[in-house]
Amino acid sequence: MPTLTKLYSMEEAATHNKQDDCWVVIDGKVYDVSSYMDEHPGGDDVLLAVAGKDATDDFEDAGHSKDARELMEKYFIGELDESSLPEIPELKIYKKDQPQDSVQKLFDLTKQYWVVPVSIITISVAVSVLFSRKT
């Protein structure tokens, strides 16, 4: 017969964040590590830092041994109710400008930059032609 697992919300787990009442969430499982605080090899500060939070990344980053993972089962009290997790908004992906658009924009800007030098050269040539005819 399958055993029923109690579900806890993330909000409920978050209220258990003290030295004498410390829960951590790892891989969607909730652990009451209150009685383990003094025994933890990294000290109680490590557990308090992640108390009432999802500590999955911190747990994995620490590189826990197989024995540590087996010891966790002793403190298992239930699972995280995934419906209690806040929804992550969907990311909108915007397409970058196509290379043709970028080239076209550059070409358009180039026209603007050449207007002044070309105008100066044209006026200079016209003035020099006019003065050379008069003399």
From Swiss-Prot:
What membrane topology does the annotation report for this chain? Answer: Single-pass membrane protein
**What InterPro entries does the record point to?**
Cyt_B5-like_heme/steroid-bd (IPR001199), Cyt_B5-like_heme/steroid_sf (IPR036400), Cyt_B5_heme-BS (IPR018506), Cytochrome_b5 (IPR050668)
Query: Which GO cellular component terms, listed alphabetically, does the Swiss-Prot or TrEMBL entry include?
Result: chloroplast outer membrane; mitochondrial membrane; stromule
Which keywords fit this entry according to its UniProt record?
Chloroplast, Heme, Iron, Membrane, Metal-binding, Mitochondrion, Plastid, Transmembrane, Transmembrane helix
Where does the UniProt annotation locate this protein?
A: Plastid, Chloroplast membrane; Mitochondrion membrane
> In which residues is heme bound?
40, 64
Q: Which superkingdom?
A: Eukaryota
Q: Which Pfam families match?
A: Cyt-b5
Gene3D superfamilies recorded: Cytochrome b5-like heme/steroid binding domain
Query: Where does the UniProt entry say this protein principally localizes?
Result: plastid
- Indicate whether Heme appears among the record's keywords: yes
- GO MF, any single term: metal ion binding
**TM spans, by residue?**
113-132
| Stretches assigned to the Cytochrome b5 heme-binding domain | 5-81
**How is this protein organized at the quaternary level?**
Interacts with BI-1, FAH1 and FAH2.
Q: Which family does it belong to?
A: Belongs to the cytochrome b5 family.
Q: What protein am I looking at?
A: Cytochrome b5 isoform A
Upper lineage is: Eukaryota, Viridiplantae, Streptophyta, Embryophyta, Tracheophyta
